[in-house]
Amino acid sequence: MDTKLDPWSSSDITDYSKLFEEFGISPFENVLPEIPSPHMYMRRKVIFGHRDYEQIAEAMRTGAPFSVMDGFMPSGKVHLGHKMVMDQIVWHQEMGASAFVGIADREAFSVRGFSWQKCREIGVEEYILSLIALGFKPDGLIYFQSGCGSVKDLAFELGAKVNFSELSAIYGFSGETSLSHMLSVATQAADILQPQLEEFGGPKPVVVPVGPDQDPHLRLTRGLAGKMNMFRVEEREDVKTGRKYLSVRGKTAQKEALQELKKRIPGKVKLYEEHIDVLEYPDLAGLEKLVREVTVEFGGYAFIPPASTYHRFMSGLQGGKMSSSIPESQIALTDSPKEGAKKVKRAKTGGCVTLEEQKKLGGKPEECSVFELMLFHLIASDEELLEIKQECISGTRMCGSCKQLAAEKMQEFLKDHQEKRELAREHLDEYRIIYKD
């Protein structure tokens, strides 16, 4: 594999299409027609890939229960890159999802060395206030990992299903990696699976919107979901007859659970010591649902592997990668409106060197950080955005006018957002927030 995905470094991906082949991510455009009222990021191909999003789209269409889950490490200022994730959480919540947001203070403690108090301050002042200001509803759950007992308990159980060799293969961990860092990874997997615990309604589809650098967490969690489950359903083929059938297998399953399954599965079935062969039940999804129901009744886990969406990274305002450690490369949601506008005006564009060349050759919006701000955040109308793009390419729109428009819109957004942050502060006690004791 040529592409390295690291959740704790600033990844630079130049060819997103490689991720389809190397990591098994599917193109998002294939599932787009199934989504009612798709989000702006979906329509504009900012979200480029997914895993198992079909089940989320189906839940939206049918009104079935589903969840959106995401988290933020409280390690610095909340910026436009974080806003992208928050926008997707809020949209899924509006589409009917129960929403879960974890403040990854265990990760910040182990990876960044931050104190618990600092994690709490950053978590509230930066991330939680902005999340609420962007439209997060009070019926969602916000929690600090260190204060959430269900996450900590589940993380401990998950830790029994993964070893150092697996973590090394997925994350590149070495003998220098601290134990708390490895524990924070198990905690992230627990974050993702928590919405399917019985206290939150049991098994259901869960989507995690991420940048591709976070995919290692999804791969680990999907594998752990299967290892934790009481049963697994497999499609098999009789080596003698070539006939296909389904098999429900569970080495650690209670015999009573297997017997109950045998009673409920219609058609011809064969019960063995540790599995059931289902010979006349072609509906795989229906069988999986039945297996989950019986599993929960007998106190076992029946996790559905989490779905995920993958969005493009924002480039830095001066070109290259956006980095929290380089203030001029990004706009924080707590920057003053005037400072935000100034950063836009100083940003790198995709225009030509001279005005004459620009009129003759046109600009390159795909290389312009100012157009990217409009694409990701500032222009709500697809028609208006397309008009700006066409005028840029044709040479009838100059970089100065684009910067002025984007700067004005950024200033308006930051002013409005920061007013909403102060309102959010006044209403914090109306939200379900679990803090560290």
Swiss-Prot record:
Catalysed transformations (reactions): tRNA(Trp) + L-tryptophan + ATP = L-tryptophyl-tRNA(Trp) + AMP + diphosphate + H(+)
Family matches, as Gene3D superfamilies: HUPs (3.40.50.620), Tyrosyl-Transfer RNA Synthetase (1.10.240.10)
GO terms under cellular component: cytoplasm
Motif ('HIGH' region): 74-82
Keyword Nucleotide-binding carried by entry: yes
GO molecular function, one term: tryptophan-tRNA ligase activity
Cell compartment(s), UniProt: Cytoplasm
CDD domains named among the record's database cross-references: TrpRS_core
Domain of life: Archaea
The EC number(s) this enzyme carries: 6.1.1.2
Keywords, sorted A to Z: Aminoacyl-tRNA synthetase, ATP-binding, Cytoplasm, Ligase, Nucleotide-binding, Protein biosynthesis
Biological process terms in GO annotation: tryptophanyl-tRNA aminoacylation
Family stated for the protein in its record: Belongs to the class-I aminoacyl-tRNA synthetase family.
Record-linked NCBIfam families: PRK12285.1-3 (NF008926)
Descriptive protein name: Tryptophan--tRNA ligase
Organism in which the protein naturally occurs: Methanosarcina acetivorans (strain ATCC 35395 / DSM 2834 / JCM 12185 / C2A)
Lineage: Archaea, Methanobacteriati, Methanobacteriota, Stenosarchaea group, Methanomicrobia
